[in-house]
Protein backbone atom coordinates (compact mmCIF):
# COMPACT_ATOMS: atom_id res chain seq x y z
CA UNK A 1 0.00 0.00 0.00
CA UNK A 2 1.54 3.36 -1.04
CA UNK A 3 2.10 5.96 1.64
CA UNK A 4 -0.28 8.90 1.47
CA UNK A 5 1.38 12.22 0.85
CA UNK A 6 0.05 14.93 3.12
CA UNK A 7 -0.16 18.33 1.48
CA UNK A 8 0.65 21.38 3.57
CA UNK A 9 0.44 25.06 2.85
CA UNK A 10 -2.11 27.26 1.20
CA UNK A 11 -4.42 25.85 -1.45
CA UNK A 12 -4.96 29.29 -2.97
CA UNK A 13 -2.90 29.86 -6.07
CA UNK A 14 -1.45 33.25 -6.92
CA UNK A 15 -3.90 34.78 -9.37
CA UNK A 16 -3.31 37.90 -11.41
CA UNK A 17 -6.30 40.16 -10.72
CA UNK A 18 -5.58 43.74 -11.88
CA UNK A 19 -8.97 45.30 -10.99
CA UNK A 20 -11.09 44.78 -7.90
CA UNK A 21 -13.69 46.10 -5.49
CA UNK A 22 -12.99 46.96 -1.85
CA UNK A 23 -15.93 46.65 0.52
CA UNK A 24 -15.43 48.58 3.77
CA UNK A 25 -18.02 47.85 6.43
CA UNK A 26 -17.48 50.32 9.23
CA UNK A 27 -19.61 50.03 12.36
CA UNK A 28 -19.12 51.73 15.71
CA UNK A 29 -17.61 48.52 17.11
CA UNK A 30 -15.46 47.16 14.26
CA UNK A 31 -14.27 47.71 10.68
CA UNK A 32 -14.22 44.89 8.12
CA UNK A 33 -12.35 45.28 4.80
CA UNK A 34 -13.04 42.73 2.04
CA UNK A 35 -11.28 42.92 -1.32
CA UNK A 36 -12.98 41.08 -4.19
CA UNK A 37 -12.46 40.76 -7.92
CA UNK A 38 -14.99 42.41 -10.25
CA UNK A 39 -17.27 39.34 -10.18
CA UNK A 40 -17.41 39.32 -6.36
CA UNK A 41 -15.03 36.48 -5.38
CA UNK A 42 -13.12 37.40 -2.22
CA UNK A 43 -9.37 37.77 -2.75
CA UNK A 44 -8.40 39.04 0.69
CA UNK A 45 -10.07 40.34 3.80
CA UNK A 46 -9.15 41.73 7.17
CA UNK A 47 -10.84 43.29 10.15
CA UNK A 48 -9.83 45.29 13.19
CA UNK A 49 -10.37 42.19 15.33
CA UNK A 50 -8.27 40.01 13.01
CA UNK A 51 -5.51 42.64 13.17
CA UNK A 52 -5.14 42.05 16.90
CA UNK A 53 -7.39 44.71 18.42
CA UNK A 54 -9.86 43.74 21.14
CA UNK A 55 -12.88 45.39 22.71
CA UNK A 56 -13.48 49.10 22.26
CA UNK A 57 -10.17 49.59 20.39
CA UNK A 58 -11.63 47.75 17.36
CA UNK A 59 -13.82 50.77 16.63
CA UNK A 60 -10.94 53.25 16.37
CA UNK A 61 -9.66 54.80 13.12
CA UNK A 62 -6.19 53.33 13.71
CA UNK A 63 -7.62 49.81 13.88
CA UNK A 64 -9.43 50.44 10.57
CA UNK A 65 -6.17 51.67 9.03
CA UNK A 66 -4.32 48.54 10.17
CA UNK A 67 -7.05 46.27 8.79
CA UNK A 68 -7.07 48.07 5.42
CA UNK A 69 -3.27 47.85 5.16
CA UNK A 70 -3.30 44.11 5.86
CA UNK A 71 -6.01 43.43 3.26
CA UNK A 72 -4.29 45.67 0.68
CA UNK A 73 -0.94 43.92 1.17
CA UNK A 74 -2.51 40.54 0.33
CA UNK A 75 -4.37 42.01 -2.67
CA UNK A 76 -1.16 43.54 -4.03
CA UNK A 77 0.46 40.09 -3.83
CA UNK A 78 -2.32 38.83 -6.12
CA UNK A 79 -1.45 41.56 -8.65
CA UNK A 80 -4.22 44.06 -7.93
CA UNK A 81 -3.60 47.65 -9.02
CA UNK A 82 -6.95 49.48 -9.51
CA UNK A 83 -9.86 49.37 -7.07
CA UNK A 84 -13.35 50.72 -6.57
CA UNK A 85 -14.26 51.42 -2.94
CA UNK A 86 -17.75 50.74 -1.55
CA UNK A 87 -18.21 52.08 1.98
CA UNK A 88 -21.03 50.88 4.23
CA UNK A 89 -21.88 52.06 7.73
CA UNK A 90 -21.42 55.04 10.06
CA UNK A 91 -18.19 54.03 11.83
CA UNK A 92 -15.09 56.02 12.70
CA UNK A 93 -12.77 54.12 10.36
CA UNK A 94 -14.31 54.99 6.99
CA UNK A 95 -11.96 57.72 5.77
CA UNK A 96 -8.89 56.26 7.47
CA UNK A 97 -9.36 52.90 5.74
CA UNK A 98 -9.67 54.60 2.32
CA UNK A 99 -6.52 56.62 2.98
CA UNK A 100 -4.63 53.48 4.04
CA UNK A 101 -5.60 51.75 0.77
CA UNK A 102 -4.24 54.72 -1.19
CA UNK A 103 -0.97 54.78 0.75
CA UNK A 104 -0.56 51.01 0.24
CA UNK A 105 -0.24 51.62 -3.52
CA UNK A 106 -3.71 50.83 -4.86
CA UNK A 107 -5.18 53.28 -7.39
CA UNK A 108 -8.72 54.25 -6.37
CA UNK A 109 -11.02 54.88 -9.34
CA UNK A 110 -14.35 55.26 -7.51
CA UNK A 111 -15.61 55.81 -3.96
CA UNK A 112 -19.27 55.05 -3.36
CA UNK A 113 -21.31 55.13 -0.14
CA UNK A 114 -23.64 52.13 -0.10
CA UNK A 115 -24.96 52.52 3.46
CA UNK A 116 -28.46 51.01 3.55
CA UNK A 117 -31.15 53.57 4.39
CA UNK A 118 -34.60 52.30 5.40
CA UNK A 119 -37.66 53.78 3.72
CA UNK A 120 -39.33 53.55 7.14
CA UNK A 121 -38.84 49.83 7.63
CA UNK A 122 -38.28 48.23 11.02
CA UNK A 123 -38.77 50.12 14.28
CA UNK A 124 -35.51 51.52 15.68
CA UNK A 125 -34.19 50.34 19.05
CA UNK A 126 -35.03 52.60 21.98
CA UNK A 127 -32.59 55.39 22.89
CA UNK A 128 -29.82 54.57 25.37
CA UNK A 129 -29.91 56.51 28.63
CA UNK A 130 -26.45 56.54 30.17
UniProtKB/Swiss-Prot annotation:
Briefly, what is this protein's role?
Located on the platform of the 30S subunit, it bridges several disparate RNA helices of the 16S rRNA. Forms part of the Shine-Dalgarno cleft in the 70S ribosome.
Statement: the UniProt record of this protein carries the keyword Ribonucleoprotein: yes
Q: Which family does it belong to?
A: Belongs to the universal ribosomal protein uS11 family.
* Subunit record text: Part of the 30S ribosomal subunit. Interacts with proteins S7 and S18. Binds to IF-3.
What species does this protein belong to? Prochlorococcus marinus (strain MIT 9301)
Highest taxon of source: Bacteria
Which InterPro entries does the record cross-reference, listed alphabetically? Ribosomal_uS11, Ribosomal_uS11_bac-type, Ribosomal_uS11_CS, Ribosomal_uS11_sf
Q: Which keywords fit this entry according to its UniProt record? A: Ribonucleoprotein, Ribosomal protein, RNA-binding, rRNA-binding
Q: What is this protein called?
A: Small ribosomal subunit protein uS11
